[in-house]
Amino acid sequence: KFKIYHPGGNIGQTLLLVKDIMIKERNKIPLINFNSNIVTAIKTISKKNLGIGIIIKNKSVIGIVTDGDIRRGTKNYSKKTKIAVLMSRKPLYVGENTSAAKALSIMAENKITSLIVSSDSDYKKHKVFFKPKGILHIHSLLKYGIK
């Protein structure tokens, strides 16, 4: 409980895990069906306000798409184009028991602002397709003082 009640302290920061601060609520996670078109993806990404969409097929992650990917892609594709055409395959992700500090380090190294969160068993097996448990945005890390 120390990590929850004292998140701003050095000890609290090192104890916080991704699962403690990730977005877990399904209605807040930007999930997009792989058959959706660009317009549907834009609406979902805008509504969830994270700048990213998680592309799902059969309840498993198959890729991601960012608002920047869509902006660049609309020059070459119609609004009816399936979002799977624009997605990045094999997105970076972390297990739910990864330290928040490690997650921030991964984001900084890869110049990204969000990480998909999986179960630890999927993460340890390095699964290509996995069920998302949540999403971690850099703003959540900063809110808890993770550096």
Model-flagged regions — what are they?
Residues K1-L16:
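YjeF_N-associated NAD(P)HX repair module
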Residues H6-G9, E25, S140:
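Glycine-rich beta-alpha junction loops
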Residues I52-I54, K59-P91, E96:
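Helical hairpin unit composed of two closely spaced alpha helices linked by a short loop
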